[in-house]
Amino acid sequence: MSNGSDFISPDVAPDELQSAVSWDAILAGAAASIAMLFVLLSLCAGFGLKVSPRWPGGVSAEDFTPIVGAAFVACQIVASMLGGYLAGRLRTKWLHVHDHEVHFRDTAHGLLAWAASVVGLLLLGVLAAPDTTTATPSPAEMLRAAHIGAQLSLFLGVGALTSAFSASVAAAIGGMRRDDMHRLHRTMR
């Protein structure tokens, strides 16, 4: 029978019992990343709609695809950096862990926040996808759509890779800032 002495407070838990992964920080970073991505994409869409009528005869999809792709890449990077920074900054303090391990864990938190935001966006995309039971397009329209889709996929892939890296770097920066603030408050006591 336990008399309650088995309970270990998280504040004084041995290092072996402390998790290296702070899921609360990761999910908070992912949520912030998704929210920021929606805001940035809305701004880009509004800017694109505002600018597109200025071209005589409108803008063809082939001409507009690189612009949209570059906007997607930029939005992904900025949103992922925010999510990664928050994941690194909000994580718990690890005691008795070497600086190299802290840096690795911070970058892992950024990468996990990025991955969680990608999974969240995929789930939102599946839930919001329209029913595709419309008329069959002509072969020329299908070829044109495939060409545009391939270009956008390339931009989204580049954006995904660069935003994963950006989230990891931002998490390392956020973690360093968190640890620096912790040291500063400790010396002021």
Segments from the language model and where they lie:
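Alpha-helical transmembrane segments and their helix-start/interface "positive-inside/aromatic belt" motifs
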Residues: E16-A35, V68, H103-V119, V169
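Functional transmembrane-helix hotspots
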Residues: L122-A140
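Mid-bilayer segments of alpha-helical transmembrane spans in multi-pass integral membrane proteins
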Residues: I77, M81, Y85, G110, ...
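Perimembrane loop-to-helix junctions flanking transmembrane segments
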Residues: V51-T65
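Alpha-helical transmembrane segments of multi-pass membrane proteins
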Residues: A32-L49
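Interfacial helix-start motif at the membrane-water boundary
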Residues: E62-Q76
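Short, membrane-exposed interhelical loops at transmembrane-helix boundaries
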Residues: V59-S60, S138-L152
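Juxtamembrane interface at the cytosolic side of transmembrane helices
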Residues: F165-R189
